[in-house]
Amino acid sequence: MLSALARPAGAALRRSFSTSAQNNAKVAVLGASGGIGQPLSLLLKNSPLVSRLTLYDIAHTPGVAADLSHIETRATVKGYLGPEQLPDCLKGCDVVVIPAGVPRKPGMTRDDLFNTNATIVATLTAACAQHCPEAMICIISNPVNSTIPITAEVFKKHGVYNPNKIFGVTTLDIVRANAFVAELKDLDPARVNVPVIGGHAGKTIIPLISQCTPKVEFPQDQLTTLTGRIQEAGTEVVKAKAGAGSATLSMAYAGARFVFSLVDAMNGKEGVVECSFVKSQETDCPYFSTPLLLGKKGIEKNLGIGKVSPFEEKMIAEAIPELKASIKKGEEFVKNMK
């Protein structure tokens, strides 16, 4: 069922560069001057799906906007600087993407980012709740396992919460799983689709290799190694960059892919499926990432976990306590805010 609905990875990105796509989405990027924000803004500017691109950050946005505005594509670009300009950046937006926050450095986990990024996400999502309450909210800022509950609680506080419109962008886990499986099996990565469920940190990242299309088989030792590599791929990049940042280019690609899928669905395209960390009843965890059928109003249907192998079943059971703790941490943060 899922395999039939899921289009091959990257199809949305490729299609977004074709001229036949509808061209009307108003998209805001909050944290547009950062390591993810700049390449993400470039990919969004390059897409005919986007008609207006508004960029927000606390530094350098006028320069980033000026640079992007010289690109010969239809999207208009405007930069907004500092909290007093944030309301204007958000007005009339259909989609808001938030990569704002501090990146990981060697030796740090995504959870180490919590104290700084929790405040940033709470502040930015409060502005979204006030100035574009109907927009789709796509959170990239880590730790996603906590920043999505933060976003939900902030929207609840403002009385505008809609669980079908708040997404934790876990797409990079799927992109990596597709790339790594394709590499091992000598397949075209654009034709590989591996659902990745659970959360977006370490052991909570659960690639469902048993549901991969096309079907692939690995001996258990290779499967364990592959799963571990997908779970720790972010750390692999942090180490390789040796203190000069985290995964920015691949994250920008994954973020753009998710936005284009969402906009396609909002434009009425049928059968658009992406995994995302959202409010969920699929497990006893209040938030969980699974494949979602996207529609005009956000989540049309949660497609659930589906049939999993005993190895995957065990990973799900082990991930849930950690996920619950991260979720609670996010919820408590908002409850304790002044």
UniProtKB/Swiss-Prot annotation:
The modification N6-acetyllysine is found at residues 78, 91, 165, 185, 215, 239, 296, 301, 307, 314, 324, 328-329, 335. Transmembrane segments: none annotated. One of its GO terms (biological process) is gluconeogenesis. The active site is at residue 200. This is Malate dehydrogenase, mitochondrial. Glycans are attached at residue 33. The modification Phosphoserine is found at residues 246, 326. Homodimer. GO terms for molecular function: L-malate dehydrogenase (NAD+) activity; protein homodimerization activity. The modification N6-malonyllysine is found at residues 239, 307, 329. NAD(+) binds at residues 31-37, 57, 117, 140-142, 251. PANTHER family: MALATE AND LACTATE DEHYDROGENASE, MALATE DEHYDROGENASE, MITOCHONDRIAL. It is found in: Mitochondrion matrix. Residues 1-24 form a transit peptide. It comes from the Eukaryota. Its main location: mitochondrion. Substrate binds at residues 104, 110, 142, 176. One of its GO terms (cellular component) is cytoplasm. The modification N6-succinyllysine is found at residues 78, 91, 185, 203, 215, 239, 269, 296, 301, 307, 314, 324, 328, 335. InterPro entries: L-lactate/malate_DH, Lactate/malate_DH_C, Lactate/malate_DH_N, Lactate_DH/Glyco_Ohase_4_C, Malate_DH_AS, Malate_DH_type1, NAD(P)-bd_dom_sf. The lineage of its organism: Eukaryota, Metazoa, Chordata, Craniata, Vertebrata.
